[in-house]
Amino acid sequence: MARATHFKALALLPAFALAGLTMACGAGGDGSGGTSQPAGGTAASQSAEIPAVAKDPALAAMVPQAIAADGKIVVGQDQSYAPNEFVDEQGKVVGFDVDLGNAIAQKLGLTTEYQNAAFSGILAGLGAGQYELAMSSFTINSERLQTVDMVSYYSAGTSLAVPKGNPDKISLDDLCGKNIAVQQGTVQVDDLAARSQQCTSSGKPAINVQQFQQQTDVNLQVQTKRSQAMLADSPVVDYAVKQTGGAVEVVGEPYDAAPYGIAIKKDQGSYAQAIQGAVQALIDDGTYAKILAKWGLNTSGALTKAELNPQS
């Protein structure tokens, strides 16, 4: 994802937005209902430490020699996408993806280095060798699988959110002529383009798609009523609702559920299989469930099997 405009009205920003703006996300969200706590969990759960993960020598042996020798995995991500990846009030990079990435690295006997970047440029940076993994709430789709390998780790969909009370009576079925905020590079951009085409084909006005570089800017647009609504991953929308104290609210149910994927540059031997094996091991030993609970992600999106290129 990525946006074109940054706003200076910091007094209006809740802590989650301020955190994202101090540094520089993919699409997803739950595709179905669930009974778990709202995205973001509680302050107590977010401060909980995830137990260290034991190294798996067999998986570690599958890591490329250059990465193993360096002792760390350089991970590209857009740190404006709470609760998945963001910067907290202490300036620390945190989130669901961060904790899972750390656990994956530990399983391979490595550490992590997270590098912040605009979402729309992360996969290109991965291909250019700038990163050794890309983990930033990327939805797995056929277009991305043409250029990278991807390991699934959570199933998410898209949610529609509006200012409190839905003053413009926005609904997913009628976005024609409306100002809808979205992060650049996300699957929601493509979704809105298709919906806008349907509008104009039926003689209605096109959707005014307002694209921004960071998800925090998208959230602020809706919170301050500069935009009439936004589309984003449902865990992210749920978190925005929680962190704004209800200044933003969800309309309808999440839709178009699809798996998030960890992106790996193609043609790196068994490296992708090592990542897949590490994620599966974390699912099997319960670490994955603990990370989901810490960040309050809906368990309906939890996977029992990590797959390599599941749509290929």
What are the language-model segments listed below?
Residues F138-L145, A193-R195, Q223-D256:
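A ligand-binding cleft/hinge motif common to bilobed small-molecule-binding domains
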Residues S155-V162, D238, K242-Q280, L297-S312:
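Periplasmic-binding protein-like
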Residues G26-G29:
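Bacterial signal peptide processing site
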Residues Q79-A82, V93-Q106, F138, A156-Q214, ...:
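Bilobed "Venus flytrap"/periplasmic-binding protein-like clamshell domains
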Residues G20-A24:
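C-terminal motif of bacterial Sec signal peptides marking the signal peptidase cleavage site
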Residues M1-L13:
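Bacterial N-terminal signal peptides that target proteins for export
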Residues T111-D173:
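Acidic, polar ligand-binding/catalytic clefts
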Residues G34-S136:
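Extracytoplasmic small-molecule ligand-binding "clamshell" domains
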